[in-house]
Amino acid sequence: TFINHKCKSSSECLPACKAAIGRASGKCINSTCKCYY
């Protein structure tokens, strides 16, 4: 699941994914966070 959160590294996505979907799992793809359920 892509969320509207710009990133430079995958670590930036973890708190964003935690807030968005309740799970701190994801990575940075094309400067956007992708979260995994």
From Swiss-Prot:
GO annotation, cellular component aspect: extracellular region
TM region(s), chain numbering: none
Compartments reported by the entry: Secreted
InterPro entries documented for this protein: Scorpion_toxin-like_sf (IPR036574), Scorpion_toxinS_K_inh (IPR001947)
MF terms (GO), sorted A to Z: potassium channel inhibitor activity; small conductance calcium-activated potassium channel inhibitor activity; toxin activity
Site (Basic residue of the functional dyad, important for the interaction with Kv1.2/KCNA2 channel) location in chain: K27
Claim: Lipoprotein is one of the keywords in the record: no
Disulphide bonds in the chain: C13-C33, C17-C35
Residues of the site described as Aromatic residue of the functional dyad, important for the interaction with Kv1.2/KCNA2 channel: Y36
Superkingdom field: Eukaryota
BP GO annotations: envenomation resulting in occlusion of the pore of voltage-gated potassium channel in another organism
Tissues/organs with expression: Expressed by the venom gland.
Keywords tagged on the record: Calcium-activated potassium channel impairing toxin, Disulfide bond, Ion channel impairing toxin, Potassium channel impairing toxin, Secreted, Toxin, Voltage-gated potassium channel impairing toxin
Family: Belongs to the short scorpion toxin superfamily. Potassium channel inhibitor family. Alpha-KTx 04 subfamily.
Role summary: Reversible blocker of voltage-gated potassium channel Kv1.2/KCNA2 (Kd=65 nM) and calcium-activated potassium channels KCa2.2/KCNN2 (Kd=575 nM) and KCa3.1/KCNN4 (Kd=59 nM).
Other remarks in the entry: Negative results: does not inhibit the potassium channels Kv11.1/KCNH2, Kv1.3/KCNA3, Kv1.4/KCNA4, Kv1.5/KCNA5, Kv1.6/KCNA6, Kv11.1/KCNH2, KCa1.1/KCNN1, or the sodium channels Nav1.5/SCN7A and Nav1.4/SCN4A.
Protein name, as recorded: Potassium channel toxin alpha-KTx 4.8
Lineage, broadest ranks: Eukaryota, Metazoa, Ecdysozoa, Arthropoda, Chelicerata
